[in-house]
A protein has these predicted regions:
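Outer-membrane beta-barrel "beta-signal"
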Residues: 15-28, 353, 395, 399, ...
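Extracellular/periplasmic loop regions
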Residues: 12-34, 237-238, 264-268, 275-383
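Surface-exposed loop and membrane-interface regions of Gram-negative outer-membrane beta-barrel proteins
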Residues: 65-84, 94-138, 149-157, 194, ...
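Flexible, surface-exposed loop regions and adjacent strand-edge segments
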Residues: 72-76, 117-122, 158-162, 198-202, ...
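Signature for the C-terminal beta-barrel architecture of outer-membrane proteins
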Residues: 136-140, 153-310, 348, 368, ...
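Transmembrane beta-strands of outer-membrane beta-barrel proteins
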Residues: 54-64, 101-105, 141-145, 182-186, ...
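N-terminal periplasmic/intermembrane-space "pro-region" immediately following the signal or transit peptide
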Residues: 3, 7-79, 118, 295-300, ...
């Protein structure tokens, strides 16, 4: 299929586990001569007539503990939860012309004292299920599917939550000569807790096009895109109304001589009820690899807020369906009416071990607008007043013990600034550990 190219060797296959499991191609292991590990014969089976069936899955166990989530504005006190997620999938292909991908999921959680969000629990259900038809570099996909676009600032799978984000709909993808172009019309999956009862959220829709250039002679690559969003019920500090939003964006990213960069700009127009939308964001992630194991980084973001509520124009940026958590594992803030500066350092003392530390300084972009909690919830008591939201300091470790086994941990300490203290905000902590096994 045009959406995934077969790796050159079985060993490369084993290093090629991907966040989007449909991006993997294990057909090399259908050749008995390339099977070198005990379960290789199970991983890929020749089903005759030029067709193959590959199997895979992931088991993740994650523990979280939090004190005063979202600066104590969501709840006060301490809470903890154990999250269990099991994913299994089958990938049947008839060469590169026809493909059927099916992924089932079981997501469970212990009971939180503050109440479990909808993204915690779902009995066995269809996580993904789609049909691909491929001709040359063009692939047409229809069905339920996960999606990551570019940096994930606007559309991503939301892997931190127990239930990853998926969409129902169609996508056309073209890959040729280093170009990647996608056109899509999708609606988010509506999560329901019982078995096989997840439907389509018809109150929302996402459509548009996304293109990525080939590498450009030492200056990186460029994404450019248009994304449309409809929400029958959009909620902002300015009120609740039908939202029709158009996002026009560009992203420049790459690395050279120890320097890496990822810079993205988006402008938004549309309608929010009777009001017109005029919003924007500018985001950057810059890094300098001082020595082989050490990277110094700086993230800086501005997501516009609403300067004058009631003036007939909504200025609050909407990040659509972004990666969450967005800044740290504590999932403290949504990228709306926000200015953020996050210096950090990353150390890789061993090839598969990454240690990181950062501090994130947060301000409201517009005083008159609210502070927005994830995913995009305005906290009414934070309208007006000061800009200083507060800070969060993060320590994290990511150890890929083997290509199949990954251990992760994070600690975040956060404290409110004047704008949040005035609304009753408090300091808090977040701790997370997880183990994930892919197969």
């Amino acid at each position: 299929m045009a959406l995934a190219a077969a790796p050159a060797s079985a060993e490369n296959d084993r290093r090629g586990y991907a966040s989007l499991r449909y991006d993997e191609d294990w057909r090399a292991l259908c050749d008995p001569a390339r099977r070198t590990q005990p379960f290789d014969a199970v991983k890929c089976r020749d089903t005759g007539g030029g067709t193959t069936l590959t199997l895979g899955g992931e088991l993740r166990e994650r523990f979280e503990a939090v004190r005063n989530p979202v600066f104590g504005l969501a709840a006060r006190g301490s809470d903890r939860v154990l999250l269990h997620r099991l994913l299994v999938h089958a990938d049947w292909r008839a060469g590169d012309a026809v493909r059927v991908f099916v992924q089932l999921a079981d997501r469970r959680a212990t009971t939180r004292g503050f109440g479990n969000p909808p993204t915690d629990r779902d009995a066995v259900d269809l996580a993904q299920g789609f049909l691909d038809l491929g001709v040359g570099g063009l692939t047409l996909r229809a069905g339920r599917q996960e999606l990551d676009l570019g940096s994930g600032r606007l559309v991503a799978v939301r892997d931190g939550a127990n239930i990853r984000r998926a969409f129902d709909g169609g996508r056309a993808s073209w890959r040729r000569h280093g170009w990647r172009i996608d056109a899509l019309f999708l609606q988010p999956v509506a999560i329901a807790p019982a078995a096989f009862d997840d439907g389509t959220d018809t109150s929302q829709a996402l459509w548009g096009g996304y293109a990525t250039t080939p590498p450009l002679a030492g200056v990186g690559q460029i994404d450019f895109y248009y994304l449309g969003l409809r929400r029958n019920r959009g909620v902002f500090a300015a009120g609740t109304a039908r939202e029709l939003r158009h996002s026009f964006g560009a992203r420049w990213f790459g690395k050279r001589d120890g320097v890496d960069w990822d810079i993205e700009a988006v402008v938004q127009a549309g309608r929010f009820g009777a009001d017109r939308i005029a919003a924007w964001t500018l985001a950057s992630n810059l890094g300098w690899r001082v020595a082989a194991p050490l990277r110094l980084g700086l993230k800086a973001d501005i997501a516009s807020g609403d300067a004058r509520p009631g003036d007939g124009r909504l200025g609050t940026f909407n990040a659509l369906y972004p990666k969450l958590p967005y800044f740290t594992e504590a999932n403290l803030v949504a990228p709306a009416n926000l200015m953020d500066l996050q210096p950090g350092v990353t150390v890789t003392p061993a090839p598969r071990l990454e240690l990181a530390a950062s501090i994130d300084l947060l301000w409201k972009h517009r005083r008159a607008d609210a502070f927005y909690a994830p995913p995009l919830t305005p906290i009414a008591a934070t309208r007006g007043g000061g800009r200083w939201i507060g800070w969060q300091a993060s320590l994290s470790a990511n150890w890929r013990v083997t290509p199949r086994l990954t251990l992760r941990g994070a600690y975040v300490r956060f404290a409110p600034g004047a704008a949040i203290r005035a609304a009753g905000g408090r300091a808090g902590d977040f701790v997370m550990t997880s183990v994930a096994i892919k197969f």
